[in-house]
Structure formats: C-alpha cells, structure tokens
C-alpha cells in the first residue's frame, strides 16, 4: 500500500515537462526495471530557479520525481548535495523496500545534472 503523499505526487505530479534553455539535462534509466527519469533545470544566483521532470515507470518513480522537484526548488547545489535517499523516501511518506530504487534513480539523475552545473566545460547534457 502506498502513502497518501506518494499517491498525491503520482496522481498530481508537480513540475512536469522539459525546460527550454535548461542549464543542465540528465536522463537515467534503471536497467533492471526499465524506469526512466529525465530532469532539466535552470540556475539563478547559485540556486535552482526552475526544475522539471519526466518519468516513465512505476508509481514510486513518478512520485519520487515529483517530490524531488519540490524539495530542491530554490536550494543551492551544496544544500542539494546533502539530500539522501531516506530524505526523498520520507517526503513521499515512505516506500516499500522493493521500490526504494525509484528514489535512488531520481537522486542519481539530479546528481548528474548538478555535475553538469559544477563542471560546465567537461560535462555534456545527458539524454539528448
């Protein structure tokens, strides 16, 4: 059974779609289950000004993508780097152990996008 918070993020996902002129874009796929998440973000004054996601996969994958975008909006890269899987799992009201990979996939995609922000000369947008 899923929590009310998780179901709300699944049924009413926030910050969906792509950003035009994104500062970073990252897309990851879980090769085991096939879940895919794509994040695009814009920075302003060292903070995430806008973030959007697209996800294809299980209920937790979509809910975690939605919750993550709310968690990181207007946060600095340093603040975001301190987020852990358990923080995202708590934000969706918990996940079954078998679904914790959904939270990790969203965080890994975000980490890849942040790597692009921190190393713009060496990183290339992923998933294009």
Language-model regions, residue ranges each:
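C-terminal binding/interaction regions
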Residues: 2-20, 25-26, 49, 75-79, ...
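Short connector loops at helix/strand junctions that flank enzyme active sites
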Residues: 21, 34-36, 48, 63
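Alpha-helical support elements that line or immediately flank enzyme active sites
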Residues: 63-75
């Amino acid at each position: 059974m899923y929590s009310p918070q998780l179901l709300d993020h699944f049924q009413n996902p926030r910050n969906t779609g792509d950003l035009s002129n994104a500062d970073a874009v990252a897309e990851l796929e879980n090769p085991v289950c096939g879940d895919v998440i794509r994040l695009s973000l814009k920075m302003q004054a060292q903070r995430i000004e806008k973030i959007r996601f697209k996800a294809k996969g299980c209920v937790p994958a979509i809910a975690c993508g939605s919750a993550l975008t709310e968690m990181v909006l207007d946060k600095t890269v340093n603040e975001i780097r301190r987020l852990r899987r358990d923080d995202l799992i708590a934000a969706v009201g918990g996940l079954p152990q078998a679904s914790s990979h959904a939270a990790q996939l969203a965080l890994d995609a975000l980490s890849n996008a942040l790597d692009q922000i921190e190393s713009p000369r060496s990183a290339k947008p992923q998933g294009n």
